[in-house]
A protein has these predicted regions:
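N-terminal cap/lid segment of alpha/beta-hydrolase-fold proteins
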Residues: 58-96
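Short beta-strand/loop motif that positions the catalytic acidic residue
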Residues: 232-234
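N-terminal secretory signal peptides
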Residues: 1-25
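N-terminal twin-arginine translocation
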Residues: 20-28, 37-59
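Cap/lid segment of the alpha/beta-hydrolase catalytic domain
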Residues: 137-162, 270-275
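Short beta-strand element of the alpha/beta-hydrolase
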Residues: 101-109
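Primarily recognizes the serine-hydrolase "nucleophile elbow" in alpha/beta-hydrolase
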Residues: 170-226
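Alpha/beta-hydrolase active-site loop
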Residues: 153-177
Length: 306
């Protein structure tokens, strides 16, 4: 089991510990990820004990706030596109704006390219950044070719992270073609946050900014070759991902990149997803404001915008 496969499996165990899925569904999802028998039982027990010790059980709605909502952010309409990839055409949702401040690559959670992630691209476009939300399952026929979220996560886990990086680099090339002479940024959530970290640590000089949300930093990651300004966003209750924050900080400091790593103390993993059980509206609104300010600083170099 590689680093990303373990992360995705432990996320299933956390969903059980937080009451989002039941034990039967957790066992089924772990089986799709190749974790069965005693290994599955042990993982569920270990993560459950850690969650209880951290006081995060059922923490998706600790303070009584609603656990999902229609977003109040008005997105620009998105269109489905395909473009050249390293092996096959890649699928994406494209949200353009007439006078872009820059262009942003959006990387989805372990649920794949769904309406929520497409809408994030639309929100970015509404804020002045043309955005492309990539489907990292393009080679498998796209997210829509799978029967459910568990199967999507299992498929993502089987793909070498290096292939995801190649596809993201192709998406940056497409962004540069569609939005020429503008700086590029990347944002990702959960699994997508981990992928943005990997893109930032892949000797990729084209990124002016990156905003990984609650994604684990890769073991041994180095920012050599990067010039990006990095805003890392974490939930304080997300102990598993928070544990990788010191490594991210050390690597950023080693390369002397501009960065900020912010933690929303009362928020959990996936707090930005307004369709999910751990949605925290206060943290999500503030995180979005911080991201837009970060991109305005690092990506937008045009003084003509109002």
């Amino acid at each position: 089991m590689n680093e990303m496969q373990r992360y995705l499996a432990e996320e299933v165990a956390e969903d059980l510990a937080d009451g989002i899925i039941n034990r039967r569904e957790a066992i089924r999802r772990l089986g799709l990820l190749g974790v069965t028998g005693a290994a599955a039982t042990g993982m569920l027990a270990t993560v459950g004990a850690e969650a209880a010790a951290a006081g995060s059980e059922h923490s998706g709605n600790r303070d009584g706030r609603r656990t999902g909502s229609e977003s109040s952010w008005a997105p620009v309409a998105q269109e489905s596109i395909t473009f050249a990839g390293p092996r096959v055409p890649l699928m994406a949702a494209w949200a353009p704006t007439a006078r872009p401040r820059g262009a942003v690559l959006v990387i989805h959670e372990n649920r794949g390219l769904n309406v929520h992630i497409s809408t994030v691209a639309g929100r970015l476009a509404a804020s002045g950044y043309s955005a492309l939300a990539l489907d990292l399952l393009s080679e498998e026929g796209g997210t829509g070719s799978f029967p459910g979220e568990a199967e999507v996560a299992a498929a993502l886990a089987q793909i070498p992270p290096e292939r995801h990086v190649e596809d993201m680099k192709a998406a940056l090339t497409e962004l540069g073609r569609r939005v020429p002479h503008k700086k590029l940024a990347a944002i990702g959530f959960c699994f997508g946050g981990a992928m943005v970290w990997r893109l930032l640590t892949s000797n990729e000089p084209r990124l002016a900014a990156g905003a990984p949300f609650y994604g684990p930093f890769p073991e041994g990651g180095s920012f050599a070759g990067s010039r990006a300004a990095v805003l890392g966003v974490y939930g304080g209750l997300d102990s598993r991902v928070i544990a990788t924050l010191p490594a991210a900080k050390a690597a950023l400091e080693a390369q002397r990149l501009r960065f900020e790593l912010i933690t929303f103390t009362e928020a959990n993993h996936a707090f930005f997803n307004d369709t999910g059980a751990r949605f925290n509206p206060h943290a999500a609104i503030e995180a979005w404001r911080r991201v837009l300010n970060w991109f305005d600083d690092a990506v937008d170099d045009d003084d003509d915008h109002d």
